[in-house]
């Protein structure tokens, strides 16, 4: 019984499965056709709507937005133009121009600096070499040059010591007797004293006379107090005019 039941169930299941599959295939075909038709219809409708409604609206909105943005940008440009010019001027005159100037100065001065450094270096080398060569030649030409120089220096020192005014400090004790003044020198000093006194008196008299002459000249220049007081008194204008009248009359008489 079990096998017959299983076989009957399998036959029934195969029939039911075939029916269900056929139904599903038909439903899928129907749904696919419906979806295709709906898609075509929606596409056509959307094209019509977009072409007649959305596209013109989008274009108008785009033009309006661009116009507003241009107006705002122009307004901002007008406001920011002085600042932009200021920034450009600062850049060109305070950054770019000094940088270019420094660059040009560096380009022009660096070769000169290199040449000058080489010239100094070569000058040092040449001078050192020439000095060494000439010292070598002098050592062969005048081997006793150092001794002659030392002798000349000692002679100069001795001459200076002899000419030094305070040379009595270096005198030996044996020479002190020769430095004591004698009676003849004392007599000569006594004879010379009155002559010196007469000269000093004559000089004093000359200086006294010159000072007195200077005093007299200064006294003559300075008027006494009374005359200064009289001179400082103001003179009226009428008196001044009267003083000039006789001069005019005398001038007229002379001319006549």
From Swiss-Prot:
Alphabetic keyword roster: Endoplasmic reticulum, Membrane, Nucleus, Phosphoprotein, Transmembrane, Transmembrane helix
List of residues that carry Phosphoserine: 210-211
Cellular localization per UniProt: Endoplasmic reticulum membrane; Nucleus membrane
GO cellular component annotations of the record: endoplasmic reticulum; endoplasmic reticulum membrane; nuclear envelope; nuclear membrane
Membrane topology: Multi-pass membrane protein
Keyword Phosphoprotein set for record: yes
Disordered, as annotated region: 198-256
Listed transmembrane segments: 5-25, 30-50, 64-84, 105-125
Feature: compositional bias, Low complexity: 203-215
Tagged with keyword Nucleus: yes
This protein's name: Uncharacterized membrane protein C1919.04
Provenance organism: Schizosaccharomyces pombe (strain 972 / ATCC 24843)
